[in-house]
Amino acid sequence: DKEYFEVATRGVWRQIPYTQDSEQILPPSLLPSPEVYFATCLQDKEVWPIWQYLEEYDEQTLFSVIEILYDHIGVYNYETDQFENEAQKEEFAEQINNILRAYKEGYYLEPTNGFIMQIPNGALREQLEYDGSDLPDSVYEQLATATEMYYRFDANLEQKKKAINILADILESEREEVKDTLNAEYEVPKNEHDKLIFGIVNGYNIRHNRADQKNDYSKEIWYDWMMQYY
């Protein structure tokens, strides 16, 4: 009833003054059509319209549909000629999370990055809410990519390993600054901490796939630690 997906599915139209005609001022974001958009994204023709196929969705399809809807929700403000979605996203996430938290062991639509994950603890949720305002766009994009790759509901061990690798690459580009920061704040000899940081990813089959790599460890446990550490 609130038409939060009207812009996504139909675009924005307005009447041409002194005529009976209308013109499109903003194309729909689900191009070329919702049916084709969802079929292309999910490689499944039986997704849209939702009301028709909802009961046939598996978990991955359902969660992916929710994520796509979150990305495309919003309304057009004719007074300012601007597309707005902040309030709509907040409302959508709140309502969806009321449902997701009661599903199985509990899930959560992460509002900053827009992906579904298992319910995070308070410390992790605070990290996920970071908006990257004090980072260069390119670095924040890498950080957001790694975050979604690691924590999304369907992430496997290979994806988690790649996410850790991305974070290590970010630190690599700031290696000297990281050394100085650790030395100043934690009074740790900077070369020792540097060796620890990069020794992990370089020696535990994260960055390299050589015979001398340590690979016999509980990856589910240690990957979580590495992700938090980096």
What is the predicted function of each stretch?
Residues D1-I99:
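Charged interaction/catalytic cores of defense and host-pathogen modules
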Residues E67-Y70, G74, Y151, L171-R175, ...:
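Alpha-helical repeat scaffolds in large eukaryotic proteins
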Residues P34-Y53, S138-A155, Y204-K214:
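Short amphipathic alpha-helical segments and their helix-coil junctions
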Residues D58, N156-Q159, A163, K219-W222:
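Helix-start/N-cap signature of alpha-helical segments
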Residues N165, E176-Y230:
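Alpha-helical oligomerization segments
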Residues E67-Q142:
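Helix-loop junctions and short alpha-helical segments
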Residues Y108-N191:
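Long, positively charged binding patches that form subdomain-scale interaction surfaces
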Residues Y57-V65, K162-I166, I197, M226:
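Residue-level detector of well-ordered alpha-helical segments, enriched
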